[in-house]
Amino acid sequence: MTIFLLLSSLHPGNYLYGQEQPDTLSFYLPNILVTAIEPKIPGTVSLLPASTLEHTQPITIADLAQLLPGGLTNNSGVTDAHYFSVREVSLKNGVNQFHKNAAMGAQIWVDGSPLHFNAGINEPYEGYDARFLSLNQVKEAEIIRGIPSARYGNLTNSVLLLKTHQGRMPLSTSIRYNPKLKQYMLGKGFCISPQDHTLNLLADYTSQGDFHTGGIRLANLYHWLPAGKKLELSLTYTSRIGKEKQFVNEQNHTQRQRLDQRFSIQGEWQPDRRWLKKLSLRIDGSLQKSKQTKSQVNNASSQLYTDRKESGEWEAHVLSSNYMYTLVNESRPFYVETEMLVSTFFPLRQGREISLAAGFSYRSEGNEGRGRDFDRQRPPSTSIRPRSFREIPFLHTFCGFIESTYQTPNFQIEAGLRHQGLKSRDYAFIYQTEPRLNLLWSFFSSPSGYKLSLKAGVGWISFMPTLDKLYQESVYNDKVSFYYNDRNESGNSLGILTTHAPGRVRNIELKSTVNRKIEAGLIGETPTFRLDMTAFLEKQTNGFSSSEQYIPFSYREYDYLSTTQLHPEYRDGQVWVNGEAVPFQEKYSYTPVPVSVNTLHREKHGVEIVADFGTFAPLRTSLIVDGIWLCVREKNTALNGIWPIQYTDKTEYPYVGFYDKQGGPGNENRSEMISTNFRFITRIPRIGLVTTLTWQMIWLYRYRTLYNGSTGENVWPLYWCGTDGIIHPFTEAQKEDPAFAPLLSTTAPERFLSNSYKPYGMLNIRVSKAFGEHIMLAFFANNFADLRPTRYSASTRSYLQQNTQPFFGLELQIKL
């Protein structure tokens, strides 16, 4: 029906581009924007004004990605972690999911302050989990998909700039409800002086199932005009808590908690001098506490445990056969950052202008958490030790940039250079220099409204190693050397463990991961149509991964004593029974030790398109079509050891193979996707109604796993080592040696087949209804037609159901 009505309105002269026809009865509903805007500035940027956020009803910032070209709908809800990233093939088994790894390289700024999560270790909630950043306070968002300004750094994916309400906030409240999720918000602004200094207060709460989060935000804004020069000072404090319970039964339950506290002090002075137009200073701080408490029953029978952290042979605790343990993980990452910016501009003749900006920042971050702790008499497992994060050194980051913009009526160019470095104990200075360039050239313009513009950009962006990459956890391998337990005599037992503690293996050559971007685009405009098309290429090198080294060690295995009423004892490094030493054999084994490496390489290329067909007047319906063609190739060249667990005459297999493949079937993943969104936007100002019907289509989706560009059903190692620890190249002769036969890695051939699915789509609807100037009621429904086709996956030989389940919600906003 909608398509029929739309086609019936396609009559010459019945549509307007970018505007509504006059409506004398419209007195409270402006021509609001409900989609992302592609602004006319250098770079590839999407703007999301307040009206778009109110109409779209995103639950977290991760939902904003669906407004980008070719963006896909997420299954709304907060029971699972949310992550923000752009230009990623986030489909998995035909369902759109969040791309966790790419989210680490997305930089988020709130009112000019970046959020950093580089000091989190073993957290139950990752710092960049979008559920802990409220969108209720956000009034405008800007997403930089291409090459960002030189001011923004420590990223490899994108920049998300969030702006909160400026000035005095009206009394506002909103209630969002659906069968699973509930959200509440209340905010109010106050004038606290005759000079219109303001104080804004906001509180919100979100709940779904066992997950709960809520927070408050206080924002002060002061401004003066000393000697006629503008001076502003803003003070912001944000506190947020989160809590979740997973109760299986009385013997298995987990509780997670998180507390975020952030403050920001920003000052800006505009002396309006020739060489100094603006001077600003920012001081930020953040303290986060994440805690997970897990209680579970250990049903293992009579295990041995020691908490020694040195290599050697130790008398161990004999654990009970059945006991309840409690494992606590506490992480307290924090950072303090300061930044100073200066800028000026010089007007030239004929509407030309040159602007200059420079800045310097310093950040110190660490983790003061208790780490992992538990009762030593009731450990969660063997070969586990307590670990305090307070022992880990701090990270210190230094950044500086300079940037210049030259602008004429038809041409803009922005060029900048950024340099950032990271210093920590035990590591040399890690640094990276990043040149960046963006330009926009309007090379054709006619009086009748026809325009053609060219945009292009090239630049480097990089992401520094995080605390957990630089200081990985120490590894402990415990082997049972002797165990005696007299079932007829309680307490007559003795256990001896040999601990191999190779410690941490640090990669002192660890570098920052670098993404080199290049893009070019064309913008065409007519009085009734606008097209924005961007082609891009991204090559990310030195991505972070982990490589397992296998370190051999020897241990003693004492003879088994089956006779009862013996009383063995351990003294002078030997087990004794009745004054005689118990015989033993020398055995060999390996300890896998993970090492951070720069072996992940990603290449992305594709085309983004946004076409605005203007407004069809009779129906007051506009059509915007956006889409993306995206290809992603990811390869990990890490050398990983694999030790076949085989025994011959009760002796462990003596060789370890080293392969250029990961734990899966191969070392390379390729994926390709073509998706579009047809957004039909209808505005009826007389009754204050705006509706958006989105037809989302995935025309092409395919992915494949490869081994070095081909299949890898049978893969021999590149290197091998024995119990002497010496690594040797693997030769053709050894392939014929039966002793090395267990090192052949085999994979089913179908695991390397290409998975490709027929086109499929879904229908989403958004409805906003204004009641006067102060009340707004909004409704949304995702996949309301329940389009969930079944497709066959060749690589797994299984059938998969595409698309998310139907999901809907309702929101009421009141502003006074």
Region spans (language model):
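Extracytoplasmic beta-strand/coil segments of soluble accessory domains associated
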Residues: 66-115
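Short, acidic, small-residue-rich periplasmic hinge/interaction motif at the N-terminus
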Residues: 19-54
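Face-selective signature of the C-terminal outer-membrane beta-barrel domain
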Residues: 223-241, 254-427
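C-terminal beta-signal and adjacent terminal beta-strands/loops
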Residues: 542, 696-747, 757-760, 766-816
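Gram-negative outer-membrane beta-barrel transporters
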Residues: 407-410, 539, 557-708
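N-terminal periplasmic accessory domains that precede
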Residues: 35, 61-64, 83-85, 109, ...
